[in-house]
A protein has these predicted regions:
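Active-site activation/catalytic loop segments of kinase-like enzymes and analogous catalytic loops
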Residues: 355, 368-406, 420-439
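ATP-binding pocket architecture of kinase catalytic cores
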Residues: 32, 74-75, 79-111, 167-278, ...
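Active-site acidic catalytic loop and adjacent metal/ATP-binding pocket
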Residues: 167-183, 188-189, 219, 320-372
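Helical subdomain adjoining the active site within ATP-dependent kinase catalytic cores
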Residues: 425-462
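Conserved Nudix-box catalytic region and its N-terminal flanking loop in Nudix hydrolases
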Residues: 6-61, 69-72
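Juxta-kinase regulatory segment immediately upstream of eukaryotic protein kinase catalytic domains
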Residues: 110-166
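A short coil-to-beta-strand element that immediately follows conserved catalytic motifs
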Residues: 60-70, 161-168
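An alpha-helical support segment within catalytic cores of ATP-dependent transferases
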Residues: 142-161, 263-273, 277-339, 403-411
Length: 462
């Protein structure tokens, strides 16, 4: 069965633009949040898919702030979601609806966990000045208008004024993406959540573009203090279904980028790339993996994706081999360099002189071979899963660029050592991300930590 067999229920907690009140529907005799239904399922971070249903209810444009709740019933083929939004301008409520504050809502809720109770909680947060989320400022009322004004002013300064409205493209727990038309084509605004292993992406991309040229898009504008940047439209990503010969150019080009970056490690660190070299990864393995066995599970993990006790014990037992792999890999001549941290085909675009690499949120300095862990993960070419032969070709294309450092057999051994370490690097990254997420996204992303830890066990070298 396809998603077309599903039904999505969408509830809206609509906050007043300036007052600590929430919109409630009185037409049914009680108090209910505005709601809509639609066929299929919705992605909770896509304003273009979600906001039309709210526009039908309000008769006005609104800004999506965040997803508050999501659950699915596969048997009934039902998806239930709740979102927080705010109208672009203050206006009287639609017929049969009313703006209500915490006191009115609390009395109506009478201790029940229903629509009025949820609305009362949000109204209380607004009244107490807790609008938004410190890690994700775009969830606050008024943030969108500030960001849109900065974007417009930035484009005016470089002679490319906006020719239309700023639109939300993606709003979720990890980042916010806006788009706007200008006299020179569309531009993209991006900001990321505060997370311990995330970088100030605009600052880092300015540095990378200066050092590495066209392989990294240069931001048109950066607000370093607020973590905002604007990028030109560069035509979209490669996508997951492209011919193998196109994909082979990705590891080749990326290896050349890393070779150039290897001479600028201190500059990369000063720009804000995290230091995640092998000695740090070894320390994380030694401290974290045995603790996992003692805890018995991963925090914020959905029960279906918890590691088994046997897997946890195997990870703890693997620590000496992982430490040995770190030590042996450090003994190879390949130097530390720039690591992307999320290198896959959806973060690569076609450029005039070859692949261009974007989405540098996880950028760091580490062993360069760690990056190829993500290229191996479930990528499709022309609609078919990558076969072992093609993966070997991608490996060989990548390793050939490092031939000046080691003979082929030594490079192949370094690759073998790097596979479980790259998986561990990813597991550490996801652990850091999930620790700062709020429901319901934490439940969906937490499984990635377990996936990568299982990959550590699968890729351990002999």
């Amino acid at each position: 069965m396809s998603d077309g067999d599903w039904r999505a229920s969408i509830r809206w907690v609509v906050a007043h633009p300036t007052e600590p009140r929430v919109l409630l529907d009185r037409r049914g005799g009680g108090l209910a949040l505005p709601a809509a239904e639609r066929p299929g399922r919705v992605w909770t971070g896509d304003p273009a898919e979600l906001l039309p249903s709210l526009h039908e209810l309000l008769g006005a444009d609104a800004v999506l702030l965040r997803c508050l709740e999501e659950d699915e019933d596969p048997t009934a083929r039902r998806q239930r979601t709740t979102f927080l939004a705010v109208p672009r301008t203050a206006a009287p409520p639609p017929a049969g609806m009313a703006w209500l504050g915490r006191g009115e809502l609390a009395a109506a809720a009478a201790g029940r966990d229903g629509d009025a109770a949820l609305a009362a909680r949000v109204a209380g947060e607004l009244e107490d000045g807790h609008s938004g989320d410190g890690d994700r400022p775009w969830a606050a009322r008024g943030w969108f208008d500030q960001a849109a004004a900065w974007l417009a002013a930035s484009m005016e300064r470089i002679g490319r004024p906006l020719t239309g409205p700023v639109r939300q493209v993606r709003v979720w727990e990890l980042s916010c993406l806006l788009r706007a038309p200008t006299t020179g084509g569309d531009v993209w605004f991006k900001t990321n959540a505060a997370s311990p292993l995330f970088v100030n992406e605009g600052v880092v991309m300015e540095t990378l573009a200066g050092l590495l040229g066209d392989q990294v898009p240069a931001p048109l504008a950066v607000d370093a203090e607020r973590g905002w940047m604007v990028l030109d439209d560069f035509g979209g990503d490669l996508g997951w279904e492209v011919p193998a010969e196109v994909v082979e150019e990705v590891p080749r080009s990326f290896a050349r980028l890393q070779l150039r970056a290897a001479g600028h490690v201190e500059r990369l660190l000063r720009a804000g790339c995290h230091d995640r070299r092998l000695e740090r990864l070894a320390a994380q393995a030694e401290a974290w993996l045995p603790a996992l066995e003692a805890d018995g599970q991963l925090p914020a993990m959905d029960a279906a994706t918890w590691l088994s006790q046997e897997e946890l014990a195997a990870l703890a037992a693997a620590v000496p081999r992982l430490l040995g792999a770190c030590q042996e890999l450090a003994g190879h001549a390949v130097p530390p360099s720039l690591v992307h941290g999320d290198l896959h085909l959806a973060n690569v675009a076609r450029g005039p002189r070859g692949p261009r690499f974007f989405d540098w949120t996880d950028a760091c300095v580490a062993h360069p071979f760690l990056d190829l862990a993500t290229i191996r993960r479930g990528t499709s070419f022309a609609g078919e899963e990558v076969e072992a032969e093609l993966r070997l070709r991608l490996r060989d294309v990548y390793l050939a660029e490092w031939a000046s450092f080691e003979p082929p057999d030594r490079l192949a051994r370094a690759w073998e050592l790097a596979l479980p370490l790259g998986a561990l690097h990813q597991a550490v990254s996801y652990r850091s991300i999930v620790a700062r997420l709020q429901p319901p996204v934490d439940r969906h992303m937490a499984g990635s930590t377990a996936w990568w830890l299982r990959r550590v066990l699968a890729d351990l070298p002999a």
